[in-house]
Amino acid sequence: MTPRTSPLAYRRLRAPREDGAALVEPPWDEIPAALARNRRLRQSCQIDFHGVSLAELAREARGELLAEAVRYTASYAEVPHRAASAPADAGLLFLAGHQPQLFHPGVWFKNFALGHLARKHGATAVNLIIDSDTMKSHSIRVPGGSIGRPRAAAIPLDDAGPVVPFEERQILDRSLFAAFGDRTAEQIAGLIPDPLVREYWPLAVARGQETDNLGVCLAQSRHQFERRLGVTTLEIPQSHVCQLRSFARFTARLLAESERLATVYNEVVHE
């Protein structure tokens, strides 16, 4: 681990305002070069993780991640044959991630892009569920009214409850949770007569009967819905990744080099 010798170059990126437009960075046609560059960097890195090179640790981590993602996904959905039969070193892995909450279409687009890129490049796609973050709100603002006189209302999906990581956040009011789909559909009916929530929320209610964890319930039902739309990704919570042997090795190295890590981190933040 060595300090950065050249400053980072920053570019201002803005989400497009046109309907149906997308911001993709790096562009689709630059992905192959980025993959090749990443592999070269990993192979050339001389960092030693207590007797294990970075390339060896990365290979071990990919294998462990894939095995755990297959096991986790298989607990609530059918696992794609390609992923289930992938080699132990996992080959190419494409990862994305987000908190297990109800998010906007711009975030959801990322999941479809992840699946598309994995298929195109013969990789396995894994969506990392960031369950170490806390739940920011127990309700969402839903538009209603009419085109001429729109109005928004906050629709709760559960009681407020304590501020804890998603990993520990339980469903507190199952009746309130079960009714969220109908209440949301009623609120938005003047704008969208047949909203997607009517099809999606029964999946969330069904998963809620299998688990008392709110984040797990929302993420698994969303993933099930994506699979109906042709997305063949795997998923795994970050909390599960943190239990892997390779993660422990990586963490031990960071702790052993904590002073140097802090120096490099602060230099990069300052840039």
What are these regions (language model features)?
Residues N127-Q224:
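Internal, well-ordered alpha/beta segment that forms a basic, Gly-enriched binding/recognition surface
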